[in-house]
Design a protein with these regions (language model features):
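Mobile genetic element proteins and their domesticated derivatives, centered on retroelements
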Residues: 1, 37, 53, 59, ...
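Basic, flexible linker segments flanking DNA-binding modules
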Residues: 1-36, 98, 105, 109-115, ...
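Mobile-element integrase/transposase regions
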Residues: 6-55, 60, 72-76, 84-89, ...
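Short small-residue beta-strand/loop micro-motif enriched in glycine and branched aliphatics
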Residues: 60-64, 126-128, 152
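A short acidic/small-residue loop/turn micro-motif
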Residues: 67-71
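RNase H-like two-metal-ion nuclease catalytic core shared by retroviral integrases
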Residues: 94-96, 104-118, 123-147, 158-167, ...
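C-terminal domain-tail junction helix/linker
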Residues: 121-123, 144-221
Length: 221
């Protein structure tokens, strides 16, 4: 019977409706929707907090290393992200950590400083569902990418060594790494394609590096 079916091009029964699960597609957004998260990295000198932001659409990444990860540091990170990005940031997505939002029990607390920075700049602040970290998967993947290229591959005596390597990696990622999700473009080239104006990219507080490419006035915008 099997050979008979093969001879007539019927080697298997047709799929019936509902056999294959339908995968929901992510909603597309214009550039300016950033996923933000905090991770931890280690050097011989001690631990640092890695603040990471990545644009959902352009994949442009912005990172900083800090000794602490409090709400004031998070608010400062957001302000510098806004300064570094040449286009309007309309939405940020974070988890429910105290760096980004008040706890549910803090009913008498003032409006969170991170939320105030969002309001001051016309940014919608969205939160992931509690105990659903995968809803912020884009930045989780970027965290892994950064760690695999830095602390999981190299040994750093000092924080400054890690900062310099991280700065070089993020610059190479934004300006030289071609991504399948961008149809072979780099994040920089994709943003240029959008017809925007100016961008200045730097990983703070890393010291200036002559090998790190920066965008400024007179770039493709």
């Amino acid at each position: 019977l099997h050979r008979f079916l093969q001879r007539h091009g019927i080697s298997r029964l047709p799929d019936t409706e509902g056999d294959k699960p339908k995968h929901a597609k992510f909603k597309t957004y214009p550039i300016g929707y950033f996923h933000i998260d905090i991770a931890e990295v280690q050097a011989a000198e001690g631990k640092l907090r890695l603040f990471v932001a990545i644009d959902r659409t352009s994949k442009f990444a912005f990172v900083e290393l800090h000794q602490q990860a409090g709400k004031m540091v998070a608010a400062g990170f957001l302000r510098r992200l806004i300064e570094a990005v040449p286009y309007k940031i309309h939405t940020v997505l974070t988890d429910n950590g105290i760096q980004f939002t008040n706890r549910a029990c803090d009913i008498y607390a003032f409006h969170h400083i991170f939320g105030r920075v969002c309001d001051e700049n016309g940014i919608e602040h969205r939160l992931t569902k509690v105990k659903h970290p995968w809803t912020n998967g884009q930045v989780e993947r970027m965290n892994r990418t950064i760690k695999e290229a830095t602390v999981k591959r190299s040994y750093y005596e000092t924080h400054d060594q890690l900062r310099r390597h991280l700065s070089d990696f993020v610059a190479a990622y934004n300006f030289a790494r071609r991504l399948k999700t961008l149809r072979g473009l780099t994040p920089y080239a994709f943003i240029c394609q959008q017809g925007k104006k100016t961008i200045t990219v730097q990983t703070k507080p890393a010291p200036p590096n002559p090998k790190t490419k920066q965008l400024g006035r007179g770039s493709c915008w």
